[in-house]
């Protein structure tokens, strides 16, 4: 989210290499999603060798919860899932910055498609609100555990539906087909336009979102 836009201006090929790395991580990301009971690809919070998947330790070494006597879990490993939407958003940024159709055909389209599949399976329909919830996550502050409808996470998943509004939608047929599949993944879950994106405030000031979404308090 921070490095790729800079590289896109300074050296677009480096920006594309960053996403080719994510593409190399796809098999492991698909295994991670499947292990959690989801479809598509769930990209890791901490990543190293592409085939290794998420290298985040399961617990904090040497730390014990005094209340339970158990090792303190690192919940970011499973719950900080906005990374998957971040990858999809980065693909879109590269397309906007380069209009490299070969890159999109070889790498970008599949990254978008598998990200869409993950979010479609991760979101839960809320009959009362008539929208989709994304429950039990950690936002980019890395401290707010077990959050429901974290503003940044939900907004990024919502932004992943940019194809309805973008010029990209009208580009070449092969790429357009992928984007229709991206949107269609959400249509399977009743309505592609409804995901809970209300923002939460503390003391009349937005938190977390102010940093990552540029919302003024």
Spans of features found by a protein language model:
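Pocket-edge structural micro-motifs
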Residues: 45-47, 136, 199-201
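Helix-terminus loop motifs that line ligand-binding clefts
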Residues: 13-89, 95, 102-106, 115, ...
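Aromatic- and histidine-enriched alpha-helix N-cap/loop-to-helix transition segments
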Residues: 7-10, 78-89, 107-110, 149-159, ...
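Glycine- and acidic
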Residues: 1-4, 67-77, 92-102, 140-142, ...
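Short, glycine-/Ser/Thr-/acidic-enriched flexible segments
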Residues: 8-9, 50, 94, 139, ...
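Acidic/histidine-rich catalytic neighborhood
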Residues: 114, 118-161
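Active-site core of glycosidic bond-cleaving carbohydrate-active enzymes
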Residues: 1-25, 106, 162-217
């Amino acid at each position: 989210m921070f490095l790729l836009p800079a590289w896109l201006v300074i050296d677009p090929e480096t920006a594309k290499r960053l996403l080719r790395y994510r593409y190399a991580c796809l098999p492991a990301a698909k295994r991670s999603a499947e292990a959690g009971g989801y479809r598509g690809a769930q990209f890791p919070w901490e990543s190293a060798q592409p085939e290794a998947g998420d290298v985040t330790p399961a617990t904090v070494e040497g730390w014990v919860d005094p209340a339970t006597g158990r090792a303190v879990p690192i919940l970011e490993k499973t719950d900080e899932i906005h990374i998957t939407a971040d990858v999809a958003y980065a693909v879109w940024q590269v397309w906007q910055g380069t209009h490299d159709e070969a890159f999109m055909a070889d790498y970008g389209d599949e990254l978008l498609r598998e990200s869409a599949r993950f979010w479609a399976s991760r979101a839960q329909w809320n009959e009362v609100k008539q929208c989709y919830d994304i429950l039990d996550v950690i936002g980019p502050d890395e401290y707010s555990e077990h959050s429901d409808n974290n503003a940044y996470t939900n907004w990024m998943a919502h932004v992943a539906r940019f194809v309805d509004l973008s010029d990209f939608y009208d580009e070449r047929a092969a790429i357009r087909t992928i984007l229709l599949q991206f949107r269609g993944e959400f249509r399977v879950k009743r309505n592609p336009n409804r995901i809970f994106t209300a923002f939460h405030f503390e003391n009349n000031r937005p938190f977390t979102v102010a940093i990552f979404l540029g919302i003024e308090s």
